UniProtKB/Swiss-Prot annotation:
Organism of origin: Aspergillus fumigatus (strain ATCC MYA-4609 / CBS 101355 / FGSC A1100 / Af293)
GO terms of molecular function: transmembrane transporter activity
Gene3D superfamilies on file: MFS general substrate transporter like domains
Homology family: Belongs to the major facilitator superfamily.
Name this polypeptide is given: Major facilitator superfamily multidrug transporter mdr3
Membrane topology: Multi-pass membrane protein
Transmembrane segments: 50-70, 91-111, 119-139, 149-169, 180-200, 211-231, 241-261, 272-292, 340-360, 375-395, 410-430, 448-468
InterPro entries the record matches: MFS, MFS_dom, MFS_trans_sf
Induction, as annotated: Expression is increased in clinical azole-resistant isolates and by the presence of itraconazole. Expression is down-regulated by tetrandrine and posaconazole in a synergistic manner. Expression is also induced upon amphotericin B treatment.
Region (Disordered): 1-37
Keyword list, A-Z: Cell membrane, Glycoprotein, Membrane, Transmembrane, Transmembrane helix, Transport
Subcellular location: Cell membrane
A GO cellular-component term linked to this record: plasma membrane
Length: 528
């Protein structure tokens, strides 16, 4: 009995040690471990503003993608680009997604080390400044200047996304409220892209397209100012020790490798793979990423979100239509799905949605109504996006300590935004080669869409294997846990009976039962 009491006391001590508390930053000592402490959310109305600011990051980031993508042909006319130069116009969108997906890799870690609030406010200010400059590039009539401004504009969202998720992850412990906030963050993605596409199209059609960039820049500056007031301060930390923890070599290798690889894929449709610098950049990118792999030992898969970027661009160019905000419903449903379905099967369902939507797009007849294959493909693929994003961010956020929330958010956002950027390059390459540089555009569009089907099928296969393996591991883990509990219960009973010599027959029976458990691997219902 003494041993049982000691074991129970040790279990309680470990449980209390692992429990994470929620306190305000002012109450936390400077040496407090962030892995053990959650920040207290702002009180009252400020908490609603706090959540709104965090969700606005996704709204504005995807908005900056949509307000150029939808009126892309009008934007191209400003720089003297017609329909025959569609492959060159992909840089107006791809340059932005390139830096978003690349610099996210290090932005989350910077927030972990120097304060997510500081990096978030800096990101809003950077986003606003380069939105103004991007709009002013229309006066230069230089597509190179505009693409450069768009690429630099993308650094702002790269700073915003992981640090917004990190702040939410440090503020709300695992639970229903956290799941709802992360799902609201996901809702902002389709809503932001759709509304910005509408607003951008209206400005481009009736006013002038740079005005949408200038309008959004005003919003960036306002949110930065409100964020300084609403967002709680980060915990104090030793800046020197934090600097020593930053992996400068891995950061440089990761960013450089992703940049080289993406530039080569997006330039290939323009100049062709036979151009020496294109394949030199590709080879160099793979070599640098190989060095990064040796440095970091981390290589996430990015196939699913690639095919959505392919479909969205080529459907927009081919049919001149935009998808409505079908992504809101699945994002709101995800918290409830996460409560009843394991993460592995959720990811398999998401990849199946990507695959089904891509197949519908690839097989759509030319003169078919928008409300047939095209509409339903958007509806189905929305479930893929809005299940995979909140599920993966919530799973990673719950799995890592509070002090590493920024790094985990960077991982998910790097996968999404970089895949969008490189997906445009892959689709452009396939389209240019199959259509013979625009001779047969429909054939090229079909080929680009079917390539997305192949990538989605590969992603679904990997997700299905992961789901089955995860299910087997969980079942084995539950069985082992039950066996340990049964054995501990019997051993405790035997130990208690040793203190009462007059109950020898019960001790003998329990000993036989314990031997049976050891031989068969578990208790039978009859024995119980």
């Amino acid at each position: 009995m003494l041993a049982m009491a000691a074991s129970a006391e040790e279990t309680n001590r470990q449980s209390n040690a692992g429990r994470r508390s929620v306190i305000s930053p002012s109450e936390a000592p400077p040496e407090a471990e962030q892995s053990d402490v959650y920040q207290a959310p702002p009180p009252g109305l400020k908490e609603w503003l706090f959540i709104l600011i965090l969700c606005s990051t996704q709204l504005f980031v995807q908005g900056a993608f949509g307000y150029i993508l939808i009126p892309l042909h009008i934007v191209g006319q400003t720089f003297g680009q017609g329909p025959s130069e569609a492959t060159r116009m992909t840089w107006h969108v791809g340059g932005y997604s390139l830096t978003v997906g690349t610099f996210i890799l290090i932005a989350g870690k910077l927030g972990d080390l120097y304060g997510s609030k500081r990096i978030l406010v800096l990101g809003w200010a950077w986003f606003g400044v380069w939105s103004v400059i991007g709009g002013c590039s229309a006066f230069t009539h230089s597509p190179v200047f505009f693409d450069t401004a768009r690429a630099l504009q993308g650094i702002g969202p790269a700073l915003l996304l992981p640090n917004a998720l990190a702040i939410a992850g440090r503020t709300y412990p695992p639970g229903k409220k956290k799941n709802m906030i992360f799902s609201a963050f996901a809702v902002a993605a389709p809503l932001g892209c759709f509304t910005a596409g509408v607003v951008g199209s209206v400005f481009a059609q009736y006013v002038w397209w740079p005005w949408v960039m200038w309008t959004y820049s005003i919003g960036c500056f306002i949110i930065a100012a409100v964020g300084l007031w609403v967002i709680p301060s980060d915990y104090p930390r030793c800046q020197k020790a934090a600097t020593l923890q930053f992996d400068y070599i891995g950061s440089v290798l990761g960013v450089a490798g992703l940049l080289l690889l993406n530039i080569s894929w997006n330039q290939a449709p323009i100049d062709g793979w036979s151009t020496p610098y294109v394949y030199v950049l590709l080879i160099g990118g793979f070599l640098v990423l190989g060095l990064f792999e040796l440095q970091e030992r981390r290589a996430p898969g990015i196939r699913s979100w690639i095919n959505f970027a392919m479909c969205l661009l080529w459907i927009q160019q081919c049919s001149s239509r935009q998808g409505p905000s079908q992504g809101i419903l699945p994002a709101l449903a995800t918290p409830y799905l996460m409560a009843v379905i394991t993460s592995g099967w959720l990811m398999a369902i998401a990849c199946a949605a990507f695959l089904g939507g891509c197949i519908l797009q690839s097989t759509a007849p030319v003169e078919q109504s928008y409300w047939m294959n095209t509409f339903w493909s958007f509806v189905i693929m929305a479930w893929g996006m809005d299940i995979s994003f909140p599920a993966s961010t919530t799973i990673l956020s719950d799995a890592v300590p509070v002090k590493h929330q920024g790094a985990s958010a960077s991982l998910v956002n790097t996968v999404i935004n970089y895949s969008i950027a490189i997906g445009l390059g892959i689709a452009g390459t396939v389209e240019a080669e199959v259509s013979h540089q625009g001779v047969n555009q429909l054939r090229g569009y079909r080929a680009a869409l079917w390539s997305s089907v192949g990538l989605a099928a590969l992603a679904f296969g990997i997700a299905l294997v992961f789901a089955v393996c995860t299910f087997q591991e969980q079942r084995s883990s539950r069985k082992s846990s039950q066996e340990r509990e049964q054995r501990a219960c019997i051993e405790g009973c035997i130990l208690g009976l040793t203190l009462t010599p007059d109950r020898e027959w019960e001790r003998v029976e329990l000993g036989r039962l314990l031997s049976h458990v050891s031989q068969t691997g578990g208790l039978r219902s009859q024995s119980v």
